[in-house]
Curated annotation (Swiss-Prot):
It is found in: Cytoplasm. Zn(2+) binds at H569, H573, C693, H697. CDD domains: AlaRS_core (cd00673). It comes from the Bacteria. The keyword Repressor does not apply. This is Alanine--tRNA ligase. GO terms for molecular function: alanine-tRNA ligase activity; aminoacyl-tRNA deacylase activity; ATP binding; tRNA binding; zinc ion binding. PROSITE patterns: AA_TRNA_LIGASE_II_ALA (PS50860).
Amino acid sequence: MKKLSSAAIREQFLRFFEERGHVRVPSSSLIPGNDPTLLFTNSGMVQFKDTFLGLEQRPYTRATTVQKCLRVSGKHNDLEEVGPSPRHHTFFEMLGNFSFGDYFKSEAIPMAWELLTKVFELPVERLWFTVFEGDDEVPPDDEAAQLWVAAGADPDRVLRFGRKDNFWVMADTGPCGPCSEITIYIGDDLRAMSAQGVNSDDPNYVEIWNNVFMQFERSTMQPLHRPSVDTGMGLERMAMVMQGVHSTYETDLFIPLIERQLALLGADESTYRARVAPYRAVADHSRAVAFLIADGVLPGNTGRSYVLRRILRRAVYQGRTVGFEKPFLAEIVAAVIEQMGAVYPELRERADFILETVDLEERQFLRTLSGGMSILNSVIERVRASGSTVIPGDDAFTLKDTYGFPLDLTQKIAAEHGLTVDEAGYERRMEEQRDRGRRAAQFKRAAEAEVWAGIDLPPTRFTGYAAVSGSGVVQAIVVAGDQVAEASAGQQVQIALDSTPFYAESGGQVGDTGVLIGPRGRVRVEDVQRPVPGVIVHYGVVESGSVMLHDPVDAHVDSGRRAAIMRNHTATHLLHRALRDVLGEHAAQAGSLVAPDRLRFDFTHTRPLTPEQLHEIERRVNAWIRADTPVVWQELSYQAAIEAGAIALFGEKYGDVVRMVTIGCVNGHDAPSPAALAERELAGFPMCSRELCGGTHVGRSGEIGLFRIISESSVAAGVRRIEALTGPEAEAWVDAQIATLQAVAARVGAPQTQLVERVEALIAELKQRQRALDELTARMARSNLEGLLASVQSVGDIRFLAAQVEAPNAARLREMGDWLRDKLGSGVVVLATVFDGKAQILAMATPDLAGKRIHAGNLVKALAPIVGGSGGGRPDMAQAGGRDSAKIPQALEHVAAVIAAQAGV
């Protein structure tokens, strides 16, 4: 069996299938773009899910990928297993080949055999193949079994298993089918190999590849017209097999990350071997952290953000158990970027942001740890003193709520002391807190509702659809939670009238503002709500005089603000219609904000909108505005409105009689004018919007004036958000954009029509100058290093160079060492520098000396105590660190003596 690096495995897999007609497709994000039900991308087929379901057509029928994946839940992906287990991971890479109705088993299995036995040269005598044994619903997969034998497999090595192991389903509906898994025996004694080890817990049997054959429709179990293939091979496991080791952590994917930890600690391999789990956990978690942040996830308290925070903090805690006292994780994540950046460019492109995010989160967690550990230690002592072995849920909750200690960390520390945590009690307190949170969000309004519910009032008559002014009589006054007969100047007040033109906040539309003027004084209205059904309450302050129960008042809504709100509300209806026209009827309203200065519209859609889609939506809305179509409303039964085609918002409660707002619709309540019809025909598309809505609207669409989208973003899985401006606000926004363009054009000395070309030319010029600067910097660095070659010394026949240099980081120090070692040809290089006030020493030996006469690890072990530290490493390369950077010259003077002692000269 040949030995291959992980990079070679990746490339040979992709090239093999590329040569057989497959398109090499880049990895998709860890955040699924087309599946709001999935937290993270957990297999290679996720990005092709819509293709397999027939919802999406791709320009190819064969694909091959290396997909980045994350699994952090489920029986086989318990986070606590990462580290102690030799093969569990959070982040991993999945190699795959896919057929979308192209080839099937008769081509997939021979290709798999050829790749495994001819390209990867896996020993046939160690391979096992499993197929579906069949059941009452699906026949046995005899075809796959026969194809494996025809390809060259020993019939005795083709085993049959049931649905649990060899049948794949996507969901309750959609494609499904049998799968065939390839397992390799990696034990030392072939005589101990047997069929009983396959699909068992025996670590000598490693499943390396699964070939899924989608050939049935799940709901009916009828054969698919176009069966497909989906395969998945874990790169980490394949690297383990092809590098002849028994743990994925011993492969070239993880060794550099473990070595970086040891170097930072000034420890050697024996330290790692004595306690492997924490080092492995840090290595694994660093990869997950790097890729999650690169794909846009930030640490937080919910959803994906919480998963990232949990992984990152677990890595920090594991690091502390082996001696890291200060922030270190960014250094390990930097090693991930250094190692994986060539394969996944997003790591390099976002490196600074990734490292800054990791450092900030780690420092925040260290503050949490320092505050919480003393409390937890006190709890542990108290529990032990009481003779119990269980930390109460109340204490675990306090640690989480007050000190930010996550439950899993409390459980881990408790386990280290032989204790457990009352998880049920903890969850009970958490649920109580969630209930309080839900109540707190509505506490003020709930308390007010209780007050108003105790006041016997008839429903308020709303007159605001037809007017922005009106008269009414004060029915009730509430001040500081109490019903009163009179309120005086300066008091915060809540007032109910028998009739009002003020609109109460509802359906996303904010409440009106304005004034109430009575015979005794004036009230400034700052908000309007319905604390109880049917009753409209004005919230504000008595500006002058007083207001008394039963006073007649004149109610005046801020008409300019109301007009702006109406423009934005009608615009949301036009936007909703345009979204459905452009994206599809699935684009349903999921929330909105209609304010005087802007509108916000949330809708169901799984993908970001393209610039073309946004432009088309905006074009349609503005065409409908120019058409100056009447906006009409009518009250009718709910059933009649639905039959007329009105859209009812999901989750909204409607009465028997509803208000339907219609815009356009030739057969509507008020048909468009001939001019409007001509405008619509010119625009090239009809418009008909009917929605159930109790809000206030403009009389004609032309009153909106102008509509501009200013942002489009994600709110939650499967929910997008558009923010937009209308009328004067939209005009001001456009004016600002034009002013910016004019300023930029003037600054770069180009007319606006040539601005893009000028900016592109400036960018190209900047890049050219940067390249020249980089080349100059590199030449200067080489010149400085070349100068060091003049100070090469000898001990007997061994040449060596020992020097103090300036290096910004460990990676640069190693680059300098590599260059000098190569220039030296034969000899030893010892470089020292200062990072963050601490000494760092690097030793390298050329291949002819390493492990024979010179051991770099032992060399730095001898030098490290001089600078107050420790270190170690391989025979050819080792690093050490120490607290006393002032003694670097002393350590370098000692190099000759150490070399002489090692070489015996």
